[in-house]
Amino acid sequence: LNGRLLGGVVWGIWHWPLMLLVGYEYGTNYLGAPLLGLVVWCVVCFALNTLLDILYERTECIWVPAIAHGAFNAIAALPQVLVTPADTYYNVLGPMPIGLISALPMLAAAVWLTLREMKQEEKN
């Protein structure tokens, strides 16, 4: 858990310069900008990092999480390509897959899978 949490936070922080300078991910004029976006992005990265790590551990093939990461990026960009909302103020919350509301199921799955793994390790 500690490695996944640290990895997700570092991965999120890695994006911060572009988020602060050019509005990468959520734009520049959104609810709670820029602090809320930085925090939400770390939550998204923790959840995705955990799921990608589990994919790698179970398959022992780097291509599986790499393809899943690419698929997530493509899905995350799709609403931006297909829909141009008149008001981007709430982008940090949703409906984009990188919004907090959309990331909550991914976060729940990541936490549940991690807790399940921790229980299995305790039994062994």
Regions found by a protein language model. Name each.
Residues 1-13, 24-28, 53-61:
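Membrane-interface helix/loop boundary segments of multi-pass membrane proteins
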Residues 5-12, 38, 42, 46, ...:
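Residue-level signature of the transmembrane alpha-helical core
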Residues 10-22, 65-84:
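Kinked, hydrophobic transmembrane alpha-helices enriched for aromatic residues
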Residues 12, 16, 20, 57-58, ...:
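Short hydrophobic alpha-helical membrane-anchoring segments
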Residues 19-33:
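Membrane-interface interhelical connector segments
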Residues 28-29, 35-36, 70-124:
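C-terminal membrane module of polytopic membrane proteins
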Residues 48-52, 107-110:
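Hydrophobic/aromatic residues in alpha-helical transmembrane segments
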